[in-house]
Amino acid sequence: GCLDIGKTCKDDCECCGCGNVCYCPFDWFGGSWQPFGCSCAYGLKYVCAHKQKKCPNV
């Protein structure tokens, strides 16, 4: 299976669909940027080519 938008992920290949990426925003916390956690988000069209090369299941 694959992960829908908004689900927690570790890698682009886990996210459903060709155009969705695993996005890891950074948050300003305690005087430094900290990873806020990754979730599937809609990427741009160029993501598709990247995922087709990288991910066997796309």
From Swiss-Prot:
<feature type="disulfide bond">
    <location>
        <begin position="48"/>
        <end position="55"/>
    </location>
</feature>
<feature type="disulfide bond">
    <location>
        <begin position="9"/>
        <end position="22"/>
    </location>
</feature>
<comment type="function">
    <text>No toxic effects on mice at dose levels of 5 ug per mouse. May be toxic to insects.</text>
</comment>
<keyword id="KW-0528">Neurotoxin</keyword>
<feature type="disulfide bond">
    <location>
        <begin position="15"/>
        <end position="40"/>
    </location>
</feature>
<dbReference type="GO" id="GO:0090729">
    <property type="term" value="F:toxin activity"/>
</dbReference>
<keyword id="KW-0964">Secreted</keyword>
<comment type="similarity">
    <text>Belongs to the neurotoxin 09 (Tx3-6) family.</text>
</comment>
<feature type="disulfide bond">
    <location>
        <begin position="24"/>
        <end position="38"/>
    </location>
</feature>
<keyword id="KW-0960">Knottin</keyword>
<keyword id="KW-0872">Ion channel impairing toxin</keyword>
<dbReference type="GO" id="GO:0005576">
    <property type="term" value="C:extracellular region"/>
</dbReference>
<keyword id="KW-1015">Disulfide bond</keyword>
<feature type="disulfide bond">
    <location>
        <begin position="2"/>
        <end position="16"/>
    </location>
</feature>
<protein>
    <recommendedName>
        <fullName>U8-ctenitoxin-Pr1a</fullName>
    </recommendedName>
</protein>
<keyword id="KW-0800">Toxin</keyword>
<dbReference type="GO" id="GO:0099106">
    <property type="term" value="F:ion channel regulator activity"/>
</dbReference>
